[in-house]
């Protein structure tokens, strides 16, 4: 072997080593999975969540070039934990579950987009009791929240009740947790609770689909607006994938029939960028309610 040949081989080896090292560094700083793993807080029945996500999942698969797999979970905490332990790449979270995910991931979870509606979200207090007309009438009544970790079915309504001088545990006869927004309506309709609270989006959907008899169950109060749902990614996901996902959501246009079908299922007029600081008020409310230290 001549000196020049040996030198060329050595240089080639150094180049390969450098490329391999560069590749390993990239992997260390950004995870690029072959499959995009997605889930959502179970604020509705699992079958309904899967039905709503299917067209969106197909759209995101086209946008990212990745296989998209949606896996329903049993409770809110499971979504937060799965995001923190890197078993999920993208998750549909409520405002409070985002705050929990931020804390659990030491600030690395990134909220990327929300529906325009989520920037001015509200909850509806409902009843089938003709004697309940105002929040003050809830004293001594049985009441149902949604899931304990639900932003719109528990945390924010509780926060506004406390601001109005009503402490659910002290002022209501009993407090129950239905587990989901649609279940809260069922509780009130069946007389399991004299009143309850759920988010406006689910209430409107149930009314439009005639799954609630508004001659029996009605809204008697509405909360002030607050930030709620968002799509959040784990912080060490490949930035290129995060950008593709963000761009895909922001590109959804209701003027395009194929996009409108997706957006209607998501109950979104459009998607807008969001940021962690939008949920500072939610974190404050959670601390005020004793749900966070």
What do the predicted segments below correspond to?
Residues 31-96:
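Extracytoplasmic small-molecule ligand-binding "clamshell" domains
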Residues 141-240:
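Pocket-lining segment of extracytoplasmic ligand-binding domains
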Residues 77-91, 104-105, 136-139, 180-201:
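Short helices/loops that flank or line small-molecule/ion binding pockets
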